[in-house]
């Protein structure tokens, strides 16, 4: 692991070597906007903004991307809910349960699945207000997601409206699926078969499929 310093909380960002090419720009961009971001109480707390940068990228095949953290109790790990109360991760788990037949589980975490990096496009929000920090994170968000897409085969974005123009923001050619948000009305996410489709796309790219059942916590 490496680390760099920034002028505001969290003051130190610890990161895996695979993120090295974007770190100097990240530091520059963060120092420009941090004082604005940190006027608010945030979800997650600043010490957890960059926690996913500890993840390697060279072993990832799929990025599962949400728009921003939970407005309360964000952990810095996208979709993670230690007490398994958040609707998004419960819907994701339910979808994987139908796909895999696993039913006796107590939780689900995308971050423990081989080959998968869960990501949030914006790395924080004002406590209680989704997308409230979008304007501050925009340059950083684009920089980091572009870097991720240089490593993965499939980018799966959750939210048809939020990600309607995501392809225009990416420089690397990456297979992109824009699906329904897990909290979408009329149970649209339930009918969405993106997790299956991802594995078909990986096989077409001669990559190993994802074992989605690995995310279950018992």
UniProtKB/Swiss-Prot annotation:
Protein source organism: Vaccinia virus (strain Ankara)
Residue ranges the record marks as coiled coil: none
Active-site residues (renumbered): 68 (proton acceptor)
Domain of life: Viruses
Gene3D superfamilies: Uracil-DNA glycosylase-like domain
GO biological process: DNA repair
The protein's role, per its UniProt record: Plays an essential role in viral replication as a component of the DNA polymerase processivity factor. Excises uracil residues from the DNA which can arise as a result of misincorporation of dUMP residues by DNA polymerase or due to deamination of cytosine.
Protein name: Uracil-DNA glycosylase
Reactions catalysed: Hydrolyzes single-stranded DNA or mismatched double-stranded DNA and polynucleotides, releasing free uracil
EC number: 3.2.2.27
Family in the record: Belongs to the uracil-DNA glycosylase (UDG) superfamily. UNG family.
